[in-house]
Amino acid sequence: MSRSGQPPDLKKYMDKKLQIKLNANRMVTGTLRGFDQFMNLVVDNTVEVNGNDKTDIGMVVIRGNSIVTVEALEPVGRSS
């Protein structure tokens, strides 16, 4: 959540493939399906990436406080 108390503006990332870096040197890729004001994410078709190993873990909820960065892996339009 931003410092101003506003919820994150992730609408433009909905249904887009993302790479999400998490604490403890973890990383996942998947399609964003939902989020809330605490930046908890619902990610579908999720793959956990650990070096050269990739593990399909399906649909997951990622707590916002464990997210370090979010990067789009496909073009993202502007939110309205």
Swiss-Prot record:
Question: What's any GO biological process attached to this entry?
Answer: mRNA splicing, via spliceosome
Identify the domain of life: Eukaryota
Gene3D superfamilies (alphabetical)? 2.30.30.100
| Entry-linked Pfam families | LSM
Predominant place of localization: nucleus
Q: Which UniProt keywords apply?
A: mRNA processing, mRNA splicing, Nucleus, Ribonucleoprotein, RNA-binding, Spliceosome
Presence of keyword Transmembrane: no
* The keyword Cytoplasm is annotated on this UniProt entry: no
Job of this protein: Probable common Sm protein, is found in U1 and U2 snRNPs and may be part of the spliceosome.
| Family note | Belongs to the snRNP Sm proteins family.
The protein here is known as Probable small nuclear ribonucleoprotein G
Q: Which organism is it from?
A: Arabidopsis thaliana
Instruction: List the top taxonomic levels of the source.
Output: Eukaryota, Viridiplantae, Streptophyta, Embryophyta, Tracheophyta
